[in-house]
Amino acid sequence: MAARLCCQLDPARDVLCLRPVGAESRGRPFSGPLGTLSSPSLSAVSTDHGAHLSLRGLPVCAFSSAGPCALRFTSARRMETTVNAHQILPKVLHKRTLGLPAMSTTDLEAYFKDCVFKDWEELGEEIRLKVFVLGGCRHKLVCAPAPCNFFTSA
């Protein structure tokens, strides 16, 4: 089973943050711009850099109590659809990190809410998720335009 991560939009940094959720606690839900999400309590966030999690290739900041610096992710299958093909999400996100015109924050929120959360939470397709760590992080691992799959089964 893949490790469970909680996603939270950080409007101050205009990024989606992933936070590891410990098996002992799923945290309490909170309502935000992307709907009701699960937010881990501080005790549920690992301080051992995620040694107990079945994740590979994530930067050390992904397991910080403050959350990762700039993790962005999407569903591979949704990126391959004709609707989203012209957007090429990794390139869109990279443009945003450079301050160039790209998809609006509102559009990105809708994209992640409708595509990622549905596939991940409802269908349990963790293996299909791709991780993009772009810009503003000294721990960054850039995977664009050819994304890598960092979610592995335990």
Swiss-Prot record:
A fraction may be phosphorylated in insect cells and HepG2 cells, a human hepatoblastoma cell line. Phosphorylated in vitro by host protein kinase C or mitogen-activated protein kinase. N-acetylated in insect cells. It comes from the Viruses. This is Protein X. May form homodimer. May interact with host CEBPA, CFLAR, CREB1, DDB1, E4F1, HBXIP, HSPD1/HSP60, NFKBIA, POLR2E and SMAD4. Interacts with host SMC5-SMC6 complex and induces its degradation. Interacts with host TRPC4AP; leading to prevent ubiquitination of TRPC4AP. Interacts with host PLSCR1; this interaction promotes ubiquitination and degradation of HBx and impairs HBx-mediated cell proliferation. Residues 68-117 are annotated as: Mitochondrial targeting sequence. GO terms for biological process: DNA-templated transcription; symbiont-mediated activation of host NF-kappaB cascade; symbiont-mediated arrest of host cell cycle during G2/M transition; viral genome replication. The keyword Protein transport does not apply. Keywords: Activation of host NF-kappa-B by virus, Activator, Apoptosis, Host cytoplasm, Host G2/M cell cycle arrest by virus, Host mitochondrion, Host nucleus, Host-virus interaction, Modulation of host cell cycle by virus, Transcription, Transcription regulation. GO terms for cellular component: host cell mitochondrion; host cell nucleus. Multifunctional protein that plays a role in silencing host antiviral defenses and promoting viral transcription. Does not seem to be essential for HBV infection. May be directly involved in development of cirrhosis and liver cancer (hepatocellular carcinoma). Most of cytosolic activities involve modulation of cytosolic calcium. The effect on apoptosis is controversial depending on the cell types in which the studies have been conducted. May induce apoptosis by localizing in mitochondria and causing loss of mitochondrial membrane potential. Belongs to the orthohepadnavirus protein X family. It is found in: Host cytoplasm; Host nucleus; Host mitochondrion. The keyword Ubl conjugation does not apply.
